[in-house]
Amino acid sequence: MSAAREESRVPGREPLTAPVEDYLKAIYTIGKGTGAAATNEIAQRLALAPASVSGMVRRLADQGLLAYERYHGVKLTESGRRAALRTLRRHRVIEAYLAKALGYPWDRVHEEAERLEHAASDELVDRMAATIGEPEVDPHGAPIPTKDGSVDETVYTSLAELVVGASGVVVRVADEDPEMLRYLGELSILPGKRITVKSRAPYDGPITLGSGRHEVSIGPALAAHVLVAPLADRAGKRG
């Protein structure tokens, strides 16, 4: 048995397979850590048929990794949550290592990490993290769980929610779409960047953003994939 599979073992159970780890990670992400995920949301995220997802959900519930209540969605149990966080740690450390140590662009690290996360042992991932200075976030701003399973679950504001005149610092960008990441990179909408909403066109028109002397316009659908920490002096939400 490989070290990676040995370390993915839940006490009293067989080692978790890559598909099971993918399910747990998806449910954690959809439910924002502690909330519920609908089976159709899981199916959409994993690009699977809803019937296949329903069957797997029942099996994982029988294994004690999920709590499932009809019409109320799926939640991770404590053991399921721990397993999801182990997988997320491997994924996000690998992303950070690829970017910092190997110079990968931020739009390519997600797919590489998806392939590597199930094969890498926890020891290898810990060494990767140490080599690049124990990063707290991945290249897209997502928090990296610690070795003991703790993680920053702060809920941030979507850029699409900021009102005209509000400022914020970009903290996280959705990482699933490489083309979107490349485009945001070209616009310099990156974690750590301070931006101000200059104007909003009506009827879901473009949002004009300013950063220093630089201005760009993006649509609200794209802005919804960017999370910001509003700056208290001028921050606000659309209401």
Protein language model features and the residues they cover:
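Short, hydrophobic-biased segments on the C-terminal half of alpha helices
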Residues: 57-58
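A short, conserved structural fragment
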Residues: 61-69
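Key DNA-contact positions within bacterial/archaeal DNA-binding proteins
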Residues: 51, 107
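Extreme N-terminal segment that seeds HTH/winged-HTH DNA-binding domains in transcriptional regulators
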Residues: 1-47
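Mid-protein regulatory/catalytic core that forms ligand/cofactor-binding pockets
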Residues: 117-224
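Basic, amphipathic "hinge/linker" alpha-helix immediately C-terminal to the N-terminal HTH DNA-binding motif
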Residues: 72-91
